[in-house]
Amino acid sequence: MIQFRKATLEDLPLLKQWDEDPSVIDSDPMGEWDWESELSKDPDWREFLIAEADGIPIGFVQIIDPQVEETHYWGDIGAGFRAIDIWIGSPAYRGRGLGTAMMKEALRRCFAPADVHTVLVDPLASNTGACRFYERLGFDFLEDRMFDDDACRVYAIARATWAQRHA
């Protein structure tokens, strides 16, 4: 069973270790997270979460409200959206269905507020495995888009699609 808990400064060594994993690097090559700084902040528009399986930390999830996120990464976007970043940190936990369980829990969390109508993800275009993963979960491809220097594929899942597939 997957459970989320808030990421804290105590998770710093683990997050830094995961950042060195080649699969994590491949999924976010420009992702130079300043963990010390980011973990000490707690803005209303973001959740940093550690995913645990049977009490063992296995991955990381970030959920943001892109309308109010401070860097405006998603550009000018309306209300009712959430965006997710997700990865499994340790190779030992990949390929076991845990990523699917993590994403389903993240989506449940995103759609808990009644005003959220759409969840976005932006895997690298070169990360075809991640693209297939999101498609299997019911995400629809929206567009190819450059985020900084990264060529990404933007996917979205609407509340109605999620409710139909995962209710």
Q: Model segments located where?
A:
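A short, well-structured alpha-helix characteristic of acyl/acetyltransferase catalytic modules
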Residues: 1-39, 58, 163-167
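Conserved active-site alpha-helix within GNAT-family acetyltransferase domains
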Residues: 100-101, 125-143
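Acetyl-CoA-dependent GNAT
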Residues: 36-93, 109, 159-160
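A conserved short alpha-helix in the GNAT/GCN5 acetyltransferase fold that borders
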Residues: 103-111, 135
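Conserved beta-strand-loop-alpha-helix junction that forms the acyl-donor binding cleft
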Residues: 120-131, 147-151, 160
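Conserved acetyl-CoA pyrophosphate-binding loop and the N-cap/start of the following alpha-helix
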Residues: 93, 97-106
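Conserved GNAT acetyl-CoA-binding A-motif
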Residues: 112-122
